[in-house]
From Swiss-Prot:
Taxonomic classification: Bacteria, Bacillati, Cyanobacteriota, Cyanophyceae, Synechococcales
Keyword flag Transferase: yes
GO molecular function, one term: N-acetyltransferase activity
GO CC, any one term: cytoplasm
CDD domains: NAT_SF (cd04301)
Annotated transmembrane regions: none
The organism of origin for this protein: Prochlorococcus marinus (strain SARG / CCMP1375 / SS120)
Protein EC: 2.3.1.-
Family the UniProt entry places it in: Belongs to the acetyltransferase family. Ycf52 subfamily.
InterPro entries, A to Z: Acyl_CoA_acyltransferase (IPR016181), GNAT_dom (IPR000182), NSI-like (IPR045039)
Domain N-acetyltransferase, residue spans: 45-180
Name under which the protein is recorded: Uncharacterized N-acetyltransferase ycf52-like
Length: 180
């Protein structure tokens, strides 16, 4: 069970590469793990592209933010075919909890599209979404990606605008087809 972590904002003291390179930490989260530690050292969140996402835990996270349920085999296939997958865990040496997630597709050269971004509702409003987006954009830039497109529900557009994203100006340059 995820506990409420308080009403105040967490200010982050910065990024590190995980417990000074501790082998246990690396085994738990993967070689690319980065910590984001609250300024009062009370909370540690770990961002990783390498740690395997538990599909049941991911499904629970996505349901917590109101996304519709999809068959696990389709979710696994989507993850397998993604350019970038990032998990965010609240660090606990015995039972780390997945509390955030982002997924991107792309051509691996010029353009990427961010399709999925989720932070568990208990952790929203603490700055973790901003940190996750910053991590994703840095990771895409490190891959040489020049342009990033983001699809977002209307209810979260203001969040992305506050992070410097701009809406597509003409509103008619994109079309969708949905299978029944």
């Amino acid at each position: 069970m995820i506990k409420k972590i308080g009403e105040r904002k967490i200010s982050f003291s910065g990024w590190s590469n995980g417990r000074s390179g501790s082998n246990d930490f690396r085994e738990m989260y993967g070689s690319d793990a980065c910590e984001c530690i609250s300024s009062n050292d009370q909370y540690t969140f770990v961002f990783s592209q390498v740690r395997t996402l538990d599909l049941i835990e991911l499904e629970q996270l996505l349901q917590s933010v109101g996304w519709s349920r999809r068959p696990i085999r389709r979710v696994k296939k989507a993850l397998d075919n993604s350019l970038l997958k990032v998990g965010v865990w609240q660090h606990d040496p015995k039972f780390p909890r997945l509390i955030g997630f982002a997924r991107c597709t792309g051509d691996e050269v010029i353009q990427a599209t961010i399709w999925d971004v989720a932070i568990h509702p208990v952790y929203q409003g603490f700055g973790l979404g901003k940190e996750l987006m910053s991590y994703v954009l840095r990771s895409l830039k490190d891959k040489g990606i020049e342009r990033v497109v983001l699809f977002a529900d209307p209810g979260v557009i203001s969040f992305y605008q506050s992070q410097g994203w701009t809406l597509e100006p003409k509103g008619n340059r994109c079309a969708f087809w949905y299978a029944n």
